Amino acid sequence: MDIRIKEKPEEFYVKEIKKLDLKEKGQYAYFLLKKKDMTTLDAVRHISHRFGIPLKNIGFAGLKDKKAVTEQYISVKDLNEEKIRKMDGYRTENLELKFLGFSDKGLELGEIEGNYFEVVVRGVTKYHRRVFPRMKELVENYGCENYFGEQRFGSVKHAEEFIVKYLLRHEYEEAMKEYLTSLGDKRLKRLLRKAWRDWDRFLSLMPKGAKPELEVVKALRRGESFKNAFMVLPKNIRLMFVFAYQSYLWNRYLYTFVVRYLKYCKTPFLKWELAFFNDMSEVIWEEIKDLEIPYLGVEYKPRNKKAEIVMKEVLQDEGITPKMLMAERIGIKLFSDGVRKAFFKPQGLKVIEERKNSLKLSFTLPPGSYATILLRKLFCSDVKS
């Protein structure tokens, strides 16, 4: 019994929360960017192309959903007054800009206080209405598991294996085949796999919007090795391979922790499952409320013994050895350590509109937490969008 979101972009609204200290002069001009049915990167590329601004001069604090109406800030370095006038009030069908002021510092990724959401949830059944009040109370009193959401996994949902696993084994051709043929369109996936190593045929079949991937195949056609062809990809795309696998590992740590030590309900998530506590006592919460789980436990050691046991078991089950954690391939480290809070608490969680088969919710989340994860917990249900 899945709930549904994003049936229209207007049904998923996100506004970035950030205190701006702006003035009348400065090296960086700040704009409010409002967009609809468009990724942040596509919006920034459009602005760069339309106004002749180098991409590196445009800063933003986070990537916002595509199928949504979103508001976020961007900073643009070294703009003259004429260009600011042209950009202020600029609008297309999918985006609009509003000039706000200046600063001596540009925006960088992660520099926000949080995100405010208004979301219409459809497909609400009697089961969901029975579950929701109890889960809402648990979330308000305690919190929600801080799993990584779908956005961290890219095309993994259509892949057989994580690309990092192939790279660890130096299987560069298999890694490349997984990357270039993991598509939702099963027929196209089959045709691409059949055309493997016939690069002219392969190029003719590829989606035309896949620019970095097209360049990789052209490099293979020129005779580059599979290993070297990976280097044609921009570093941020290569790093996505790392983020996807590390997000999966971290989600597995938290899932195992919840299933082993707490009362829970499970929901489907891509090709896996997530578990959410559906009961809690003050005594247990006091023990786990500040729990932080490292990504690897190399530089950052787990301070919770139960989390440490779970991490060791998951890494062992995945066949990841301490030596592998130091591995470098295709110009990047395949693993990097850090810590992440196990739980987050949304602010201002409210039902702002109720209909027979739908609810409209509003809430504010801290940076790095996912609305789709919160919705899975609130309804103990998968989320389709």
Swiss-Prot record:
Catalytic activity annotation: uridine(13) in tRNA = pseudouridine(13) in tRNA
Record-level Gene Ontology MF annotations: pseudouridine synthase activity; RNA binding; tRNA pseudouridine(13) synthase activity
Keywords in alphabetical order: Isomerase, tRNA processing
EC top class named in words: isomerase
Catalytic machinery residues: D65 (nucleophile)
EC numbers on record: 5.4.99.27
Protein family according to the UniProt entry: Belongs to the pseudouridine synthase TruD family.
UniProt-listed PANTHER family: PSEUDOURIDYLATE SYNTHASE PUS7L, TRNA PSEUDOURIDINE SYNTHASE D
Functional note: Responsible for synthesis of pseudouridine from uracil-13 in transfer RNAs.
Entry protein name: tRNA pseudouridine synthase D
Species assigned in the record: Aquifex aeolicus (strain VF5)
Gene name tied to this protein: truD
